[in-house]
From Swiss-Prot:
Disulfide bonds: none annotated. This is Cytochrome b5. The chain crosses the membrane at residues 108-128. Residues 6-82 form the Cytochrome b5 heme-binding domain. GO terms for molecular function: heme binding; metal ion binding. GO terms for cellular component: endoplasmic reticulum membrane; intracellular membrane-bounded organelle; membrane. It is a single-pass membrane protein. SMART domains: Cyt-b5. Heme binds at residues 41, 65. Keywords: Electron transport, Endoplasmic reticulum, Heme, Iron, Membrane, Metal-binding, Microsome, Transmembrane, Transmembrane helix, Transport. It comes from Oryza sativa subsp. japonica. It is found in: Endoplasmic reticulum membrane; Microsome membrane. Belongs to the cytochrome b5 family.
Length: 137
């Protein structure tokens, strides 16, 4: 396979080849005409057709193709892709977390109240029990 005389295609040009009779894929920066392979593809032709018009590298790698499958690709190679025509992937940026209050005083007070209020209720209940027991005796 000689890359010297192979054409460089734009994404728009490759995207036009998206039918069962004319199917091109972009994998690893290279363009492949897989039209003749559609019927023989173990995953069916729909899998290949759904990957047209975009960079199908991730789709190809996610399946985990064998070395034999990778070697077969050479016979379908028609050229390279102009990488400047492929839209850049947007990276996931997690939402910024709100800054937490460095002054922990309100949280500290809440924790104390969570401990003291039930303790006060328990103390009040014990006091009422003792008072009512001593009244009846």
């Amino acid at each position: 396979m000689s890359n010297d005389n192979k054409k460089v295609y734009t994404l728009e040009e490759v995207a036009k080849h998206n039918s069962k009779d004319d199917c091109w894929l972009i994998i690893g920066g290279k363009v492949y005409n897989v039209s003749k392979f559609l019927e023989d593809h173990p995953g069916g032709d729909d899998v290949l057709l759904s990957s047209t018009g975009k960079d199908a590298t991730d789709d190809f790698e996610d399946v985990g193709h064998s070395t034999t499958a990778r070697a077969m690709m050479d016979e379908y190679y028609v050229g390279d892709i102009d990488t400047s025509t492929i839209p850049a992937r947007t990276k996931y940026v997690p939402p910024k977390q709100p800054h937490y209050n460095q002054d922990k005083t309100p949280e500290f007070i809440i924790k104390i109240l969570q401990f003291l209020v039930p303790l006060a209720i328990l103390g009040l209940a014990v006091a009422i029990r003792i008072y009512t027991k001593s009244e009846s005796a």
